[in-house]
């Protein structure tokens, strides 16, 4: 574990900016802001999804910011989503960084006259790059660790 009793202001600013980038991704997802979400990525980004977790074949392997539109638009199939980012790590190397973040993503949809909740436990593995003083995702790998699906009670509508 790094010793953060005293870190340079620029390192602190970079770490905060990267955390804000990770959180902005979740906020944009829940707000159905696909354009805002895409803007968090470099033009030549690489985005890979592994629905069966680590060690599985990729279910989506996308290159370029514009290729992300269908993935982000897919969230519109749900009534509401809520992404909770948890623990994360970041390793800085100048204007590049790597990191990982754990997330519980909640998805509510209409199903058979009722509502269904699908919770996905996700681990993101990221490569970040800073250009023009702004951090963006150069690569994002999304690993689904497990999924739980259950029927919701009638109370507590979005």
Regions found by a protein language model. Give the residues of each.
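Short, low-complexity N-terminal intrinsically disordered segments enriched in polar/charged residues
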Residues: 1-43
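A beta-strand edge to alpha-helix "cap/lid" segment located at domain peripheries
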Residues: 2-7, 76-158
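A near-ubiquitous, low-amplitude feature marking generic local secondary-structure context
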Residues: 1-8, 20, 51-55, 73, ...
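Alpha-helical elements of Rossmann-like donor-binding domains used by nucleotide-donor carbohydrate transfer enzymes
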Residues: 24, 67-70, 123
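Enrichment for repetitive, rod-forming helical segments
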Residues: 26, 72, 147-148
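Charge-dense, low-complexity intrinsically disordered segments
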Residues: 8, 12, 58-62, 115
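A solvent-exposed, acidic/Ser-Thr-rich amphipathic alpha-helical stretch
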Residues: 34-104
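Aromatic-acidic/polar surface patches that form glycan- and anion
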Residues: 14, 18, 30, 61, ...
């Amino acid at each position: 574990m790094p010793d953060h009793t005293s870190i340079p202001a620029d390192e602190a600013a970079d770490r905060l900016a990267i955390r804000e980038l990770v959180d902005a991704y979740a906020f944009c997802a829940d707000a159905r802001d696909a354009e805002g979400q895409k803007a968090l990525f470099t033009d030549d980004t690489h985005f890979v999804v592994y629905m069966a977790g680590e060690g599985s074949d990729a279910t989506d392997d996308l290159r370029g910011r514009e290729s992300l539109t269908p993935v982000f638009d897919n969230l519109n199939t749900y009534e509401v989503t809520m992404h909770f980012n948890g623990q994360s790590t970041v390793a800085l190397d100048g204007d590049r960084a790597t990191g990982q973040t754990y997330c519980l993503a909640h998805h509510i949809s209409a199903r058979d006259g009722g509502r269904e909740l699908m919770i996905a436990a996700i681990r993101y593995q990221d490569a970040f790059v800073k250009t023009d003083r702004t951090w963006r995702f150069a690569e994002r790998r999304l690993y689904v660790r497990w999924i739980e699906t259950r029927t919701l009670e009638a109370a507590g509508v979005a």
